[in-house]
Amino acid sequence: MAEITASLVKELRERTGAGMMDCKKALTEANGDIELAIENMRKSGAIKAAKKAGNVAADGVIKTKIDGNYGIILEVNCQTDFVAKDAGFQAFADKVLDAAVAGKITDVEVLKAQFEEERVALVAKIGENINIRRVAALEGDVLGSYQHGARIGVLVAAKGADEELVKHIAMHVAASKPEFIKPEDVSAEVVEKEYQVQLDIAMQSGKPKEIAEKMVEGRMKKFTGEVSLTGQPFVMEPSKTVGQLLKEHNAEVTGFIRFEVGEGIEKVETDFAAEVAAMSKQS
């Protein structure tokens, strides 16, 4: 067995753009033959995947699955809406989802490691970067889910509710984006931040501080209702709040998770004309 030196790994990284561990593995399998390692990496798609790794994957799918009292929600990203609809990409996301449910895996790094070889092969086949971005689990007496297309997914856990009610609550969460279950759940940090914003607005209107503070107190009650599930008007019957709906059914929501594709990812918009102009200057 040839010695796999650091300089050899470094050279392979520079020539392929692949990660250090991938290069070391390829060299070990090729018994230190760098040309054979490169050939094997090309065949496996590792080089193509490495080149795509820097591309922003902000599109993709949200998947949900419930098994009894346990549910998983998963986001898998690609670069375009076209690939998000690809059968191979969808099958890959479903396979990751099934594994997460079966193994109750909530550590995304574990999923990434488990499916890295399949991901690399899919990147080579499809030609876009693919990323298993996040996964979360929810447990409860009654679970419900809702998918708005493939871009928004929701899991809801409740007590004392039937499946239809939980489904309707999940639809509401998808549409209204609550951040907390009840107004009293809104964190002190969020309340303080909003209070300062509203106080600044009130003070700018020229009101005395005492009057401004009273105005803000009223606004804060409205704010905590707006960002909490039970304080929001129910989307299917806006004359009542979700809290009132739950009370009518003697039910309680114990948790919810809402994922939307690409949340928090800054998608780079390419100016094609500018890109061509820049390339022409380099040539």
Curated annotation (Swiss-Prot):
Keywords of the record: Cytoplasm, Elongation factor, Protein biosynthesis
Gene3D superfamilies listed in its UniProt record: 1.10.286.20, DNA helicase RuvA subunit, C-terminal domain (1.10.8.10), Elongation factor Ts, dimerisation domain (3.30.479.20)
InterPro entries, A to Z: EF-Ts_dimer_sf, Transl_elong_EFTs/EF1B, Transl_elong_EFTs/EF1B_dimer, Transl_elong_Ts_CS, UBA-like_sf
SUPFAM superfamilies xrefs: Elongation factor Ts (EF-Ts), dimerisation domain, UBA-like
GO annotation (BP), single: translational elongation
Consequence the record notes for mutating R219P: Resistant to toxin CdiA-CT-EC869, partially resistant to toxins CdiA-CT-NC101 and CdiA-CT-96.154, but not resistant to other CdiA toxins in growth competition experiments. Resistant to bacteriophage R17
Taxonomy, superkingdom: Bacteria
Record annotation: effect of changing A202E: Resistant to toxin CdiA-CT-EC869, partially resistant to toxins CdiA-CT-NC101 and CdiA-CT-96.154, but not resistant to other CdiA toxins in growth competition experiments, in vitro prevents CdiA-CT-EC869 from digesting tRNA(GUG-Gln)
Record's subcellular location: Cytoplasm
Effect of D81A: 2 to 3-fold less active in promoting GDP exchange and slightly lower binding constant for interaction with EF-Tu
Region span, Involved in Mg(2+) ion dislocation from EF-Tu: 80-83
One Gene Ontology term of the molecular function aspect: zinc ion binding
A GO cellular-component term linked to this record: guanyl-nucleotide exchange factor complex
Subunit structure: Heterotetramer composed of two EF-Ts.EF-Tu dimer complexes.
Misc note: In order to produce high amounts of bacteriophage Qbeta RNA polymerase catalytic core, a fusion protein consisting of tsf-tufB-replicase with a cleavable linker between tufB and the viral replicase subunit is frequently used.
Function noted in UniProt: Associates with the EF-Tu.GDP complex and induces the exchange of GDP to GTP. It remains bound to the aminoacyl-tRNA.EF-Tu.GTP complex up to the GTP hydrolysis stage on the ribosome.
Family label: Belongs to the EF-Ts family.
Protein name: Elongation factor Ts
Species of the source: Escherichia coli (strain K12)
